[in-house]
């Protein structure tokens, strides 16, 4: 089912949103001051291309023992910079694509996936794209650690 939905996403606009993310990734590589944003751009590019079966999860959830104060502070600064220069137009791109996809009954699941990516597009630094199973296992392990 994931494969069918990913193909449907690609055909109904996922290709265009992925190109938008690739453009943002290339811009972040070319401009030296945006180089720290490249990893986040690439992670969300993968999610935009294949949204079903993958999930964007914060790195603190993947490795709670290795919490990095620099990532939290620096990540917030980078996210604010990202939001001002890149995030808003990528978010609008996903919202517009999601609305267009929700016009037809077949496109509704894909449109909902675009709305989820739109939220991530605003604040992507510190997120990694992993399989749904890995994200669920990380959340369960964190919950066990909290209650031990």
UniProtKB/Swiss-Prot annotation:
Topological type in the membrane: Multi-pass membrane protein
InterPro entries given in the database record: Inner_membrane_protein, UCP028777, YccF
Protein localization: Cell inner membrane
Pfam families: YccF (PF03733)
Entry keyword set: Cell inner membrane, Cell membrane, Membrane, Transmembrane, Transmembrane helix
Cytoplasmic topology ranges: 38-76, 126-148
Domain of life: Bacteria
GO cellular component, one term: plasma membrane
Periplasmic side: 1-14, 100-102
Transmembrane regions: 15-37, 77-99, 103-125
Alphabetized NCBIfam families for the sequence: PRK11770.1-1 (NF008739)
Protein name: Inner membrane protein YccF
Organism: Escherichia coli (strain K12)
Lineage of origin: Bacteria, Pseudomonadati, Pseudomonadota, Gammaproteobacteria, Enterobacterales
């Amino acid at each position: 089912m994931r494969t069918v939905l990913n193909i449907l996403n690609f055909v109904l606009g996922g290709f265009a949103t992925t190109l938008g993310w690739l453009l943002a990734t290339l811009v972040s590589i070319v401009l030296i001051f945006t180089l720290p944003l490249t990893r986040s751009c690439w992670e969300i590019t993968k999610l935009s291309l294949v949204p079903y079966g993958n999930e964007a999860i914060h790195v603190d959830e993947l490795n709670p023992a290795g919490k990095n104060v620099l990532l939290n502070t620096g990540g917030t600064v980078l996210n604010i910079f990202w939001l001002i220069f890149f995030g808003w137009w990528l978010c609008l791109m996903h919202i517009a694509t999601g609305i267009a996809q929700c016009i037809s009954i077949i496109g509704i699941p894909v449109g909902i996936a675009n709305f989820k990516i739109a939220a991530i597009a605003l604040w992507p630094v510190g997120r990694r794209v992993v399989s749904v199973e890995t994200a669920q296992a990380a959340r369960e392990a964190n919950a066990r650690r909290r209650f031990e």
